[in-house]
Amino acid sequence: MESLSELQNPLLPRSPAHLHGPYPYPETPPSWSCQEKLYSYLLGGAGPAGAHQLLDPGSLQLAVEAWYRPSCLLGRDKVKEPRAGSCETSFTEDREPQEGPPEQPTGPGQAAENVTIQTVSYGVQEELRDQEDDQEEEESDATSTESESEDNFLTLPPRDHLGLTLFSMLCCFWPLGIAAFYFSQGTSKAISKGDFRLASTTSRRALFLATLAIAVGAGLYVAVVVALAAYMSQNGHG
């Protein structure tokens, strides 16, 4: 005759030998029926599908203890065991302290504005410097030109007007022409001596007398021509 447990649980196998693993456990006769029920419920077995299987609440604790035996937790214990032969190596980078004040981070917009402002100020300063340099160069050039002209004026000897004095003496009013020729010779002597001040004075006098002699001579020639014409006209009527 079948036992009461077999009648109540027809789906359970008759022997739990197929549930033995490679690691034998100490079996306790009172709790084996509960383990058998739990294994049968979890793993399933052959039997009629319409039969209802009842679970004893009191045997649940024993079933859980049987399920979580050292054989089931063997892999977990192996995983949790500390590794005696392993060691961790950490690499740390030593950063030397930077000398000077720390730089404040600036955004791209602010950096662009700073660069633009510096560029503008630099261009204005350079332009002002170029203008000042140009003005200084122009002033120095003007000063040097004036000094050169003064030097040239002082170094150039005055003219003696020899040809003009000769013409005034021979062809024009000869008394003034002779005086102009005299001052012309004095100019040449002053130039030869290096006295440019006296040479310039005598040169101006010679020029004035020669011009006056020419003017007086021209006036005399005109007067003589007019007198001659008047005389010829009177003789013709008489």
UniProtKB/Swiss-Prot annotation:
Residues 1-29, 83-111, 127-154 are annotated as: Disordered. Residues 129-151 have a biased composition (Acidic residues). The chain crosses the membrane at residues 163-183, 206-226. Residues 1-162, 227-238 are extracellular. One of its GO terms (cellular component) is Golgi apparatus. Keywords: Golgi apparatus, Membrane, Transmembrane, Transmembrane helix. It comes from the Eukaryota. It is found in: Membrane; Golgi apparatus, cis-Golgi network. It is a multi-pass membrane protein. The keyword Acyltransferase does not apply. InterPro entries: CD225/Dispanin_fam. Residues 184-205 are cytoplasmic. Belongs to the CD225/Dispanin family. This is Synapse differentiation-inducing gene protein 1-like. It comes from Homo sapiens (Human).
